[in-house]
UniProtKB/Swiss-Prot annotation:
It comes from the Eukaryota. The modification N-acetylalanine is found at residue 2. The gene is MAGOHB. Required for pre-mRNA splicing as component of the spliceosome. Plays a redundant role with MAGOH in the exon junction complex and in the nonsense-mediated decay (NMD) pathway. This is Protein mago nashi homolog 2. GO terms for molecular function: RNA binding. Belongs to the mago nashi family. Component of the pre-catalytic, catalytic and post-catalytic spliceosome complexes. Heterodimer with RBM8A. Core component of the mRNA splicing-dependent exon junction complex (EJC); the core complex contains CASC3, EIF4A3, MAGOH or MAGOHB, and RBM8A.
Length: 148
């Protein structure tokens, strides 16, 4: 496994539409800082920004999820480019590897299966689902707990 200082992850998904720039973004920094932002202007909603530090065991689990996904073996050259529907970006530094992916928003597995690289895009799709689930859980748990 890579050292903590050799790890960084950032994910962004968003679009510019009738409600302005709406997006979800999160990043894990080498020191364990999790930064989360969710901006929706729907019904005049406000931007949600949260920051928290996660334990090194969470960082190790994050690295394991990425390693298990084998995303570092993929290439986004044949993936759908960002369009008016939106864009997704995933940047990962793990050890001496630095990878970055950009594609359009993916609505469902139908979009994945109809792409020019369904196998590679499927890896990305499921990894992003796992990462979002982890981040939503961490943010939800961290900010719902009331100290005694």
């Amino acid at each position: 496994m890579a050292m903590a200082s050799d790890f960084y992850l950032r994910y962004y998904v968003g679009h510019k539409g009738k409600f302005g720039h709406e997006f979800l973004e999160f990043e894990f920094r080498p020191d364990g800082k999790l930064r989360y932002a969710n901006n929706s202007n729907y019904k005049n909603d406000v931007m949600i920004r949260k920051e928290a530090y996660v334990h090194k065991s969470v960082m190790e689990e994050l690295k394991r999820i990425i390693d298990d996904s084998e995303i570092t073996k993929e290439d986004d050259a044949l993936w759908p480019p960002p369009d008016r529907v939106g864009r997704q970006e995933l940047e990962i530094v793990i050890g001496d590897e630095h990878i970055s992916f950009t594609t359009s928003k993916i609505g469902s597995l139908i979009d994945v299966n109809q792409s020019k690289d369904p196998e590679g895009l499927r890896v990305f799709y499921y990894l992003v689902q796992d990462l979002k689930c982890l981040v939503f859980s961490l943010i939800g748990l961290h900010f719902k707990i009331k100290p005694i």
